[in-house]
Amino acid sequence: MTEPKRGRVQWDEANIVEIESNKPVRQKITEPKTPYHPMMDDDGSLSPRGRAFDECVDDMQRAEELRNVLNDAAASSSRNSSQGSGGGGWSSSDEEEEEADPMDQDEEGSGSGKNERFNAHRKAHYDEFRKVKELRSSGSFYEEEEEEDDGAKGSKSETTTNSRHTKGGNKELDATKTVSGTSSSSSPELI
């Protein structure tokens, strides 16, 4: 027998026939396909546009009428609930807020004070980060920190730095030694 050529596949056809005969019978689906109905205009021609422009304008007018009715109902129910509860609950002292749409009041409502506080905290947080970044890039951050350390430890201790590494504007304080009469410690401090 000759050796098969490299890169060619030889099929064992007897094995394939045996596998096909042992396969289980599968159920055939006899359900008809879903029919497709293209959109058609009133005149019978195919068109990608579903409705006429006038019908859309009518829908917009109906939507505006519905919004007005809902706003009136919401305003009257809020007036009734504030009068019936003896002044308890939410009530507005401003004339403008009372005349505004109730739907708009939901968006601006009672969360505005909370939202303002959140924005103030967020602004302060990012400003603090920006200030630290500026101080680090100018190097004055480390000078201020050393002055604070000197003032806090008093006259008995002296702060010395072993080494500073500058790489891409980022300064790290590797080790700080505190020298005093009885104790000395060395601990890495990253900023």
Swiss-Prot record:
GO biological process, one term: regulation of signal transduction
Gene Ontology CC terms, in alphabetical order: cytoplasm; nucleus
InterPro entries: PPI-2
Subcellular location, principal: nucleus
Entry keywords, A to Z: Cytoplasm, Nucleus, Phosphoprotein, Protein phosphatase inhibitor
Disruption-associated phenotype: No visible phenotype under normal growth conditions, but mutant seedlings exhibit hypersensitivity to abscisic acid (ABA) or salt treatments.
Sequence segments annotated as region (Disordered): 20-52, 67-191
Subcellular location as annotated: Nucleus; Cytoplasm
GO molecular function: protein phosphatase inhibitor activity
Tissues in which the UniProt entry reports expression: Expressed in roots, cotyledons, leaves, flowers and siliques.
Top-level taxon: Eukaryota
Changes after translation: Phosphorylated in vivo.
Modified residues (Phosphoserine): S45, S47
Pfam families in the cross-refs: IPP-2
Cross-referenced PANTHER family: PROTEIN PHOSPHATASE 1 REGULATORY INHIBITOR SUBUNIT 2, PROTEIN PHOSPHATASE INHIBITOR
Function: Inhibitor of protein-phosphatase 1 (PP1). Binds to and inhibits PP1 activity. Acts as negative regulator of abscisic acid (ABA) signaling. Enhances the inhibition of SRK2E/SNRK2.6 by TOPP1. May promote the interaction between TOPP1 and the ABA receptor PYL11.
Subunit structure: Interacts with protein phosphatase 1. Interacts with TOPP1, SRK2D/SNRK2.2, SRK2I/SNRK2.3, SRK2E/SNRK2.6, SRK2C/SNRK2.8 and PYL11.
Protein name in UniProt: Protein phosphatase inhibitor 2
Species of the source: Arabidopsis thaliana (Mouse-ear cress)
Species lineage: Eukaryota, Viridiplantae, Streptophyta, Embryophyta, Tracheophyta
